């Protein structure tokens, strides 16, 4: 049965053909707009503290790397853009933190023994890092 399901996916359904909603030029323009989204220093510090806390938490053997922090910053700016703002708020970071960080960390033996999921540990990290109030320019 599984083989038939997988093989059946080879057939192209005319209704499933996707049409582009923007062209490459428009996409590059949006990318430039996202890069210009403002992040206050307090918001940068919040993002960095969240990521740093994953590197010092005893339940995490390997936390979010500096590259992961940069990815979180970029995605947070994109989230702000999608919400129609030209600045990042803590909620933008919170909205995507679990998704960005969960697959980047390695749980410690202690966390595995306690059957703690990456998500539950990250929620605890978020609860223990003070959120800033500054966001706008």
Segments predicted by a language model, with ranges:
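Short hinge/gating elements
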Residues: 17, 25-37, 55-60, 105-113
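C-terminal helical "lid" of AAA+/P-loop NTPase domains
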Residues: 5, 32, 45-52, 67-81
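Conserved AAA+ ATPase core "coupling" helix
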Residues: 1-49
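C-terminal engagement/docking regions of AAA+ P-loop ATPases
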Residues: 56-137
């Amino acid at each position: 049965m599984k083989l038939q399901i997988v093989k059946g996916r080879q057939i192209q359904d005319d209704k499933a053909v996707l049409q582009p909603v923007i062209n490459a030029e428009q996409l590059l323009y949006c990318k430039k707009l996202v890069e210009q989204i403002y992040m206050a220093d307090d918001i940068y510090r919040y993002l960095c503290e969240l990521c740093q806390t994953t590197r010092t938490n005893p339940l995490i053997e390997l936390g979010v790397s500096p590259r992961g922090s940069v990815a979180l910053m970029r995605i947070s700016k994109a989230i702000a853009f999608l919400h129609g703002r030209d600045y990042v708020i803590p909620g933008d970071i919170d909205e995507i933190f679990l998704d960005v960080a969960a697959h980047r960390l390695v749980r410690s033996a202690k966390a595995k023994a306690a059957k703690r999921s990456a998500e539950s540990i990250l929620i605890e990290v978020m609860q223990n890092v003070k959120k800033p109030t500054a966001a706008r320019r």
